[in-house]
A protein has these predicted regions:
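Internal alpha/beta domain cores that form substrate/cofactor-binding pockets in large enzymes
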Residues: 73
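Alpha-helical cap/lid subdomain in secreted, periplasmic
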Residues: 51-55, 60, 80-206
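Serine-esterase "nucleophile elbow" of acetyl-processing enzymes
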Residues: 4-5, 13, 18-70, 82-90, ...
Length: 206
């Protein structure tokens, strides 16, 4: 199967008896790029719903996409400490896209993948379906001063791919999506959010 993420997603829908008529609930758990952070203001701001990928994906597909992004979030150490994750029985897909802030704090791609494995493993029996998404690679900018940091962000996708295979969960690789970052090299531009939503929807065949 060429598109593994789409295969797992559609298989999940079939198992749960879901179809295009019934909306699927997708919890999008991530950092500031899921939240929709706009770094252009002095204290930062948030893009409007029409320019955030979670809201765009919901409008594009007709499915309920819940924005559970938070600025500065790293991979949680203890999933049971998060009230949001104790209600997974009400969510059909748990989409997680984290790791960028771990890299910015000095972790390597391998270390980030290890943290993600520790986070996801206890969630496996509690979630109907987990979808692991590799964050788009960073680019040189105000927050990304070295090529080494860019390289680690590129390597993260490969580490996540291996992890997804190990955990037998679907994986989406965004390395070649060319998501446009702002001046800081990290956060999506408004157009970047639109491209991300479009490509993710196609990846999942939504």
């Amino acid at each position: 199967m060429k598109n593994i993420a789409a295969y797992h997603f559609l298989r999940c829908c079939a198992i749960m008896g879901l179809s295009g008529v019934i909306a699927v609930r997708i919890l999008c758990f991530g950092d500031s790029n899921t939240y929709g952070y706009d770094p252009r203001g002095f204290f930062g701001d948030r893009y409007g719903a029409k320019d955030r990928w979670v809201d765009l994906l919901s409008k594009q597909t007709g499915h309920e996409c819940i924005n559970a992004g938070a600025n500065g979030r790293e991979i949680p150490r203890n999933p049971y400490a998060l009230p949001l994750l104790t209600e997974q029985q009400e969510v059909d897909i748990f989409l997680v896209m984290l790791g960028t802030n771990n890299l910015l704090q000095g972790a390597t791609a391998k270390e980030v993948a290890t943290s993600m494995e520790i986070f996801l493993t206890p969630l496996l029996p509690r979630c109907k379906q987990i979808l692991l998404v590799a964050p788009p690679p960073m680019k040189r900018g105000a927050w990304v001063p070295t090529d080494e940091l860019v390289a680690e962000s590129i390597c993260l996708a490969e580490e996540y791919k291996l992890l997804a295979e190990k955990l037998n969960i679907p994986f989406v690789d965004t390395r070649h999506w060319n998501i446009e970052p702002t001046f800081d090299g990290v956060h999506f531009t408004e157009s970047g959010h639109h491209v991300f939503a479009e490509k993710l929807g196609k990846e999942l065949h939504l």
